A protein has these predicted regions:
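Residues in the recognition helix of alpha-helical DNA-binding motifs
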Residues: 354-358
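Structured, helix-rich domain cores that form ligand/interaction pockets
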Residues: 1-338, 342, 362-400
Length: 400
């Protein structure tokens, strides 16, 4: 895991109110202005006041981000305070770097450290409250050290041609992001779900404005200068769930919980959960028909064409079979060259509201190429995710 955000409602105490901007203060319902009381009746009002923590601590101390929201309920005549705590990188928080990965067994240490760091910045909360706090954001992640014969850039190039449906980024948006980072980062988004892929080591060597990981610790700088990472490429895979409803939808079955039950900080440290989530999210990309076409491994356009012809001929020699072979090749070649989203978007500009027909055609097209493997890089990532080996600093010394 990497980023985690969770909420505490009233079960905390702030001892250093001046650390917040504006300065933190508590009010009763009777102290609210007339306008605030009116706002408290509106269900669209998320909060009345927001306090952001700006602690005066040593920059070497990796602290959580904290925001407090003041919310009023006109029906009960009460004012509540909800604290949102975000740890932007659990490995950095616990290990001072995120080359390494945390373990399931680190749960108690991380919860204790959270209580300790919060106390340092003027917030008193119990370990039990942290453990049972509902989670609102969680980023699952995996570092995969690539063998020398696999180029990370080729993997990112393949993934940039994939698509996850109409709600996701267009391929054009993905290419803009890739160009901004010299082709070193690929994002796929779906509302509050997001996939992110990049080179972990190269990212840390970039200027802050171009990095995915904006906060570089002093220890990470030392590691970069003292360890020989020069010949290593590390594929960073992050699957980000950015809303509590999305988290419940993804995790309630894996945790044997009902959808209505909250997912807590302690729940996230369940054995096997991280692998299950990341493997499932990866397969969601690979199993879509348009992505199967995008990720095909073929030496040349002619090889792909001849393979499709032979497969179609084996089915039957009718004119229908020939037509199927021709449009299958056209779809496959266009998607490999320009990306699934671009092809689908351009088709939809001409044949409006024909999504179901196109989806059906894409599914049929995969039947003629289902015996062509995915690219070597994609296959390598799939294999490494299934193995899900723990990564620490010794892993970088030995490689794979």
């Amino acid at each position: 895991m990497d980023t985690i955000s969770f909420r505490l409602k009233n079960n905390f105490r702030i001892t250093s109110i001046a650390n917040f901007i504006p300065e933190f203060s508590i009010r009763s319902f009777s102290e609210l202005s007339q306008k605030e009381r009116i706002l408290s009746k509106d269900p669209k009002t998320n909060y009345l006041r927001k306090f952001i923590l700006h602690p005066l601590v040593d920059k070497e101390i990796y602290c959580p981000s904290v925001e407090v929201y003041e919310k009023a309920n006109a029906n009960t005549g009460t004012v509540d305070y909800e604290m949102v705590i975000t740890i932007h990188s659990l490995p950095k928080f616990h290990l001072n770097n995120n080359f390494e990965e945390i373990k399931i067994s680190d749960r108690n240490k991380i919860i204790s450290l959270t209580v300790e760091r919060l106390f340092t910045i003027g917030i008193s909360v119990s370990e039990e409250s942290i453990g049972q706090a509902p989670v609102s954001v969680i980023h699952f992640c995996k570092n995969i050290i690539l063998p020398n014969n696999i180029a990370l850039r080729s993997i990112l190039s393949d993934l940039s041609h994939t698509d996850m449906g109409k709600a996701y980024d267009t391929t054009e948006d993905v290419h803009r992001q890739r160009d901004k980072n010299n082709g070193k980062v690929v994002h796929l988004r779906c509302g509050t779900r997001e996939w992110c892929f990049y080179d972990k080591i190269d990212d840390l060597c970039q200027p802050k404005g171009k990095r995915v990981d904006k906060q570089k610790t002093i220890y990470e700088k030392e590691l970069l200068s003292t360890h020989n990472f020069e010949n290593l490429e590390v594929f960073r895979y992050e699957y980000r769930l950015n809303k509590s409803q999305t988290i419940r939808s993804e995790l309630h079955t894996l945790l044997n919980k009902s959808y209505d039950e909250k997912i807590t900080v302690s729940d996230l440290f369940t054995e096997g959960l991280w692998k299950s989530v990341l493997v499932k999210a990866w397969k969601q990309i690979l199993q879509r028909p348009e992505n199967q076409l995008a990720l095909l491994s073929c030496d040349s356009s002619l090889d792909l064409l001849l393979h499709i012809f032979r497969k179609a001929k084996a089915e039957n020699l009718s004119a229908h079979s020939q037509n199927k072979a021709l449009w299958t090749y056209g779809l496959a070649r266009a998607i490999k060259d320009y990306g699934a989203k671009t092809v689908k978007s351009e088709l939809n500009k001409i044949w409006i509201k024909k999504d179901n027909r196109l989806t059906n055609k894409l599914g049929i097209a995969t039947e003629l190429v289902d015996d062509i493997p995915v690219s070597q890089g994609i296959s390598c990532i799939t294999e490494q995710l299934e193995r899900f080996e723990f990564i620490d600093l010794t892993s970088f010394k030995r490689g794979i």
